[in-house]
Amino acid sequence: MHLSNLLKVNYRFEGPHQVDVIDGGTLAQLLIPLITSYDYVIVIDCVDAGGGKIGEVYFFDFDNVPNVITWQGSAHEVEMLQTLRMTEVNGDLPPVKIVGVIPSIIGSETAFDLSKEVAEASVTMEKIVLNHLQELGVEITRIDSKTIDEIAPLSYKGF
């Protein structure tokens, strides 16, 4: 959520491909019509990886998920996996890249702040997304320089 908002605030995307940055939140299966409306999707999300450390970043094709990715974390992670699989079973899944980070578990406390590890990982994730978009021919212009720590407390308002 925070990284998608950071991308919306800090960058303008132009070129032969339309880029929409959408905070899917916890909409899970409600995202299926949205996902199927695109030719290509990049999902930015939390992942669980056996033996991984908080803040580790993974970048992979959904049709070639690394063996260390277990999808055993939060209900949200499982819902995203189910959403992508349901879309795939229907034959409507476009190519999907996933940029994932191992999160810090916050327990029962609701918070919009990021752990230090995930905040640091968000810089790597931002670079991965931007580099990949450029590889796809998207022209990127930086229009602001907000940090993830500035964005996070306001993410609930949307951007």
UniProtKB/Swiss-Prot annotation:
Keyword Protease: yes
Family: Belongs to the peptidase A31 family.
Annotated gene: hydD
Protein biosynthesis listed as a keyword: no
Protein name (database record): Protein HydD
Originating species: Wolinella succinogenes (strain ATCC 29543 / DSM 1740 / CCUG 13145 / JCM 31913 / LMG 7466 / NCTC 11488 / FDC 602W)
Domain of life of the source: Bacteria
Keyword annotations from UniProtKB, A to Z: Aspartyl protease, Hydrolase, Protease
InterPro entries xref list: Pept_HybD-like_dom_sf, Peptidase_A31
GO molecular function: aspartic-type endopeptidase activity; enzyme activator activity
GO BP terms, alphabetized: protein processing
Pfam families for this protein: HycI (PF01750)
